[in-house]
Each structure stands twice: as C-alpha cells, then as structure tokens.
Amino acid sequence: MALTYSSMLELGTQMPNFELENTVNNEIFSSLYFNSTRPKLVMFICNHCPYVIHYHKELVKLSHDYKDHLDFVAISSNDIVNYPEDSPEKMKELAIELGFFFPYLY
C-alpha cells in the first residue's frame, strides 16, 4: 500500500451538498438529509483497506453509541475496475454483515 499524504479540513468547514447511492437500499442519499444542527462524521472507507478492516467493529460500535449525537455516513470513492471488492454489491454485503448503522455510499 502506498503512503499517501492526506489532510483534514478545518473543523467547522461547511460540507458541500452531494448525492450518492446508498448501497444498502439503492436509494439516492443527499447530504441535505442530515440533521442540520448536529455534527457530522463523514468517513471515507472501502472494503479492501486493511486499516479500515481493522476498525470495522469499532466503527459499528462508535456509530451505535453516538447515533443520537452525530450524523454518520461512510463513502467509498474507489475505482471498482481496479478494486472489484469495493463494488456497490460487495459494499452492501459488508454493511449488512457488519450491521452498519449508517449509510454506506458509492
């Protein structure tokens, strides 16, 4: 796995509007569905990443423990041609298997 520099947006940065497919129910999820007054946790994850796999159970626990205080959403932006295990169908399988309490978007 290549080391890629990434940076965090400043806390309090307004999230841009977006629409992506929720792989679990095949519905379009809009950022406008979020509760406007609560903080949001937007996670960029994928099925094949060993770092994410290591935290699967913790993500589920965190989302369950804080579901009344935070809006959670996970987004995969991977290239499914190069990473077929990150396809929407596989994302749905994983979300159901792990019991995600949050939308898993592609």
Where are these regions (language model features)?
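Loop/turn elements at helix/coil->beta-strand transitions in domains of secreted/extracellular proteins
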Residues: 38-39, 68-71, 99-102
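Short, hinge-like loop/turn segments at secondary-structure boundaries
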Residues: 36, 89-93
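N-terminal "domain-start" segment that seeds a small globular fold
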Residues: 1-32
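Typically the conserved alpha-helix immediately C-terminal to a functionally engaged Cys/Sec
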Residues: 51-67, 85-90
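A general structural signal for stabilizing positions within well-ordered secondary structure
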Residues: 9, 64, 94-96
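Active-site loop/turn elements of alpha/beta-hydrolase fold enzymes
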Residues: 77-79
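Short active-site neighborhood of thiol/selenol oxidoreductases, capturing the structured segment around
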Residues: 29-55, 59, 72-73
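Short, internal strand/loop/helix patches
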Residues: 92-106
